[in-house]
From Swiss-Prot:
Organism placement in taxonomy: Eukaryota, Metazoa, Ecdysozoa, Arthropoda, Hexapoda
Similarity field: Belongs to the queuine tRNA-ribosyltransferase family. QTRT2 subfamily.
Cofactor note: Binds 1 zinc ion per subunit.
Binding annotation for Zn(2+): 330, 332, 335, 361
Name of the molecule in the record: Queuine tRNA-ribosyltransferase accessory subunit 2
PANTHER family reported for this sequence: QUEUINE TRNA-RIBOSYLTRANSFERASE ACCESSORY SUBUNIT 2
Cited NCBIfam families: tgt_general
GO cellular component: cytoplasm
Cofactor(s) the record lists: Zn(2+)
Primary role: Non-catalytic subunit of the queuine tRNA-ribosyltransferase (TGT) that catalyzes the base-exchange of a guanine (G) residue with queuine (Q) at position 34 (anticodon wobble position) in tRNAs with GU(N) anticodons (tRNA-Asp, -Asn, -His and -Tyr), resulting in the hypermodified nucleoside queuosine (7-(((4,5-cis-dihydroxy-2-cyclopenten-1-yl)amino)methyl)-7-deazaguanosine).
Signal sequence bounds: none
Subunit record text: Heterodimer of a catalytic subunit and an accessory subunit.
Record InterPro entries: QTRTD1, Queuine_tRNA-ribosyltrfase, TGT-like_sf, tRNA_ribo_trans-like
Length: 429
C-alpha cells in the first residue's frame, strides 16, 4: 500500500491518495480523507453485493473486516484457500483486517497474560500473537493491524493505560517477527497501532516504538480512545482531539493515519483538521439500526440549515403521509424511488426492505459528505463546513434506546392510514 500526500492546507487538514495494492490493478486509487466500508460477517450490513455495486459504481472499495465478526469463519476460509476476500466474494476490493468491530461495544476486562480476548458469535476466544498471525496467514488481508491491547477509553485507570502500551509493544514485535518470515503475507501492508489511552506520555512512548520499526509500517492505526459502538458518538471531544492532535504531530507526514469509530460528523471534521486520513462507515450503520435517515446538510450555501434536523426517525408517525424522499435533492436509490411514508409503513410491518432502503440512503449521504470534505480541504474551508453543520437542529438520541418498529417511544401502537396502504401497493420494490 502506497500513500501519496498531495496537499497540506493551513487550517483544514490534508489531501492524499492510497494505491499500490499488489494484487489489484494499478488503477485502484482512493482519494483521502476517505472511508473504509464497515462489514459484518464479510458483508456490508443489509446490502447484497449487487446493491453495494449499484451504490458505489462497482469500483474497488476499501473493505474493513473485524476479527470478532469473522473469527467464526477461520476454518472455512482455510479450506477455501483463497483468503478472506475470495471467501466473501470481494476479491476486487482492498481488504483491511482489524481486531474490533467499531459498531459493537467492547466487553472490558479479561486481560490475561500474553493474550487478547476477542468476542465472536461463539463467545470469547483468546488470541496469542502466534495464533493471531496463523489466522492472518489464512485470511491474507491486503492491510492488517497486528495484535494489540487497545482496551482503554476516557475512564481507564493509569495502570490500565500503561498495561495497554506495554502489552502492545510485546504483541507487535512478536507479530512482525512472523510477518517478516511469512511467504503468504509478502504483499500485505501493516499498520502500526498507537495506544496509551488518554495519557500523553504513554502515547508518546507508543509513537516512539512504532517509529523505531517504521520500515515495517505502511501507516498508523490510532486506537484506545473509546469503547466502540455508540460510545464514539458520545465521547468528550476536547480530550480526544487533544490526544489525536498530539499523536498526529509526532507521526511522519508521509504515512496515512487511520481512526475508526462512529464519530459524529462534527467530530469527523475536527479529526480531519488534525490530520486523520481514513475513517469507517460504522456511523451510518448505527443510524440505520436506530431507524434514522441522515439529513445533515454539507452544502454551506443552504440558508435553511437552522431549521433542519440532522437526522429523521422514520418510525415516527409524523411521516405516515409524507410522500417525498428522505432528503430533498438526494439522488440515492431510496430517495428517488421511495418515500418517507412507504418506509414508515415498512417499519410498521417489520419488512426487511426498511433497513435496506435506509442503509442505501445513509451510506450514499455519508459518501457525499466525504466528497464535500475533500472539496473543503482543497479550498482550506473546513472551518466553514464545521460552523454550517453545527447550526442543525439535533434530534435527541433517546438515551440509546432503539425504538421498536411500529411503536412510538412510549410504546403506543402506530396505525397506518389508508393512504399509506395505497402507497405501499403502488410503489414497486
Amino acid at each position: 500500500m502506497k500513500f501519496v500526500l498531495e496537499t497540506v492546507s493551513k487550517c483544514s487538514g490534508r489531501l492524499g491518495s492510497l494505491s499500490g495494492v499488489d494484487r489489484l490493478a494499478s488503477s485502484a486509487k482512493f482519494q483521502t480523507p476517505t472511508l473504509v466500508l464497515h462489514t459484518k460477517g464479510g458483508s456490508v450490513p443489509h446490502l447484497s453485493k449487487e446493491v453495494l455495486h449499484y451504490l458505489t459504481g462497482a469500483e474497488p472499495q476499501l473493505m474493513q473486516y473485524s476479527l470478532n465478526g469473522t473469527v467464526h469463519m477461520e476454518e472455512a476460509v482455510r479450506g477455501c484457500g483463497d483468503g478472506l476476500s475470495g471467501f466473501v466474494a470481494q476479491k476486487e476490493s482492498v481488504s483491511l483486517l482489524v481486531l474490533r468491530d467499531p459498531a459493537e461495544p467492547c466487553q472490558p476486562g479479561y486481560h490475561e497474560k500474553d493474550v487478547v480476548p476477542v468476542f465472536g458469535r461463539s463467545g470469547r476466544k483468546n488470541f496469542t500473537a502466534e495464533s493471531y498471525m496463523s489466522l492472518v496467514e489464512a485470511f491474507r488481508p491486503d492491510v492488517y493491524v497486528p495484535l494489540f491491547d487497545g482496551d482503554t477509553d476516557g475512564g481507564s485507570s493509569k495502570k490500565r493505560e500503561q498495561r495497554s502500551q506495554e502489552r502492545t509493544e510485546t504483541f507487535v514485535e512478536q507479530c512482525l517477527e512472523v510477518h517478516r518470515k511469512s511467504e503468504k503475507l509478502k504483499g500485505a501492508s501493516v499498520l502500526g497501532p498507537i495506544v496509551g489511552g488518554y495519557n500523553k506520555k504513554l502515547r508518546e512512548k507508543s509513537v516512539q516504538f512504532v517509529e523505531r520499526l517504521k520500515d515495517d509500517f505502511a501507516g498508523y492505526f490510532i486506537a484506545g480512545l473509546h469503547s466502540y459502538g455508540s460510545s464514539a458518538s458520545e465521547v468528550k471531544e476536547a480530550p480526544l482531539l487533544d490526544i489525536v492532535s498530539s499523536v498526529c504531530q509526532q507521526l511522519p507526514l508521509e504515512k496515512p493515519k487511520f481512526l475508526f469509530g462512529a464519530f459524529t460528523p462534527q467530530l469527523v471534521l475536527e479529526l480531519v483538521v488534525r490530520g486523520v486520513d481514513i475513517f469507517d462507515t460504522s456511523y451510518p450503520y448505527l443510524k440505520t439500526q436506530q431507524n434514522r435517515a441522515l439529513n445533515f446538510s454539507f452544502d454551506t450555501s443552504d440558508s435553511n440549515v437552522v431549521a433542519r434536523k440532522n437526522e429523521l426517525d422514520l418510525t415516527d408517525a409524523c411521516w405516515a403521509e409524507d410522500f417525498t424522499g428522505f432528503v430533498d435533492g438526494c439522488q440515492c436509490l431510496a430517495c428517488t424511488k421511495h418515500t418517507k411514508a412507504y418506509t414508515h409503513h415498512l417499519y410498521n410491518t417489520r419488512e426487511m426492505l426498511a433497513p435496506i432502503l435506509l442503509m442505501i440512503h445513509n451510506l450514499h449521504h455519508y459518501f457525499e459528505f466525504f466528497k464535500a470534505i475533500r472539496r473543503h480541504v482543497a479550498q482550506d474551508t473546513v472551518g466553514e463546513l464545521i460552523a454550517h453543520i453545527n447550526k442543525h437542529v439535533v434530534l435527541p438520541v433517546t438515551d440509546g434506546v432503539v425504538k421498536e418498529p411500529g411503536k412510538s417511544l412510549d410504546g403506543v401502537e402506530l396505525k397506518e392510514s389508508a393512504s399509506v396502504q395505497v402507497e405501499a401497493k403502488r410503489v414497486k420494490v
